[in-house]
């Protein structure tokens, strides 16, 4: 039997995103920032984080999302017909610090794929990473700039994130 445990409820997620928004604004003071969510749940979190950052700055910042289906290094070992979403990056990356947003950081392979996909659209001034949960167990030298919750897990455990789309 698999044991299920809620680690962050909706209020916790909201408070965590508010904190991360403050950190993003503080760390990037005076520099143009754009948020890019990694499909699927990262895109929902990026939308929520975007609104908070815009409210703090009292201005609009670019928001996009990126699909990494064809950039994954396990593409051949997954389903033969990967689910592909359109990426939406309607701004020049070169002008911005791009904050990649994802739900859970685990091995780092998703982030590696997202960075590769991002650079196919241009060369950002810098790239930062914001995650709701960091599980550890990295296989690549990837470290988040903004972490909602450090969540040590066994490799055999799963972390499921359920977020309401805004």
Describe each model-derived feature in a short phrase.
Residues 1-166:
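PRPP-associated nucleotide enzymes
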């Amino acid at each position: 039997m698999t044991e299920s445990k809620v680690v962050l409820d909706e209020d916790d997620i909201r408070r965590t995103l508010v904190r991360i928004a403050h950190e993003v604004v503080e760390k990037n003071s005076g520099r143009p920032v754009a948020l890019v969510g990694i499909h699927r749940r990262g895109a929902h979190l990026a939308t929520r984080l975007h609104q908070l950052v815009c409210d703090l700055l009292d201005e609009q910042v670019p928001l996009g999302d990126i699909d990494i289906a064809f950039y994954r290094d396990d593409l051949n070992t997954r389903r033969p017909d990967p689910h592909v979403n359109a990426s939406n990056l309607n701004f020049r990356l070169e002008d911005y610090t791009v904050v990649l947003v994802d739900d859970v950081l685990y091995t780092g392979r998703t982030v590696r794929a997202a960075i590769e996909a991002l650079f196919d659209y241009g060369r950002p001034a810098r790239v930062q990473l914001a995650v709701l949960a960091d599980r550890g167990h990295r296989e690549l030298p990837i470290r988040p700039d903004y972490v909602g919750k450090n969540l040590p897990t066994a490799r055999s455990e799963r972390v499921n994130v359920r977020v309401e789309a805004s």
